[in-house]
Amino acid sequence: MISLKAQYGLKAMVSLAAHYGKGPLQAKDIASSQDVPVRYLELLLSQLRRARLVDATRGKKGGYYLAKKPNTITVYDIVTAFEGSILFSQNGRNESDNFAFVWKNAEKLLVKHFRAMKISDLIPKLR
């Protein structure tokens, strides 16, 4: 349903949220705390930068930081940065299918849930 890439991206974003206001975090530190290979995490962070959720500074004290306040970034923002959208109804299913309403309703519920959940709400889950 939700890719491993999006799951790791969410974990990285929550790590950055927990560090918000304390300066940038280096990719290696995020990677070790989330048990993700550094090179893979850097690819994810670059995708989050393109989505304007993360920014970075170069140099010895450089690293990554949130581009917005943690209480304004939703799980939906992060998942769609990786997935593009959350669609159950078009996963090879015909819209005229008698059960298309099931997938549409599931999609609406998940989108509503992800939009309501801020990454700041997930910080306690890191510990």
Regions found by a protein language model. Give the residues of each.
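N-terminal helix-turn-helix DNA-binding core of bacterial DNA-binding proteins
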Residues: I2-L10, V14-V36, Y65
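Basic amphipathic alpha-helical segments that dock to polyanions
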Residues: L16, L44-R49
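Alpha-helical residues within the helix-turn-helix
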Residues: S32, R49-R50
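Key DNA-contact positions within bacterial/archaeal DNA-binding proteins
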Residues: R39
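Beta-hairpin "wing" of winged helix-turn-helix
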Residues: L53-L66
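Conserved segment of winged-helix/HTH DNA-binding domains
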Residues: P70-N94
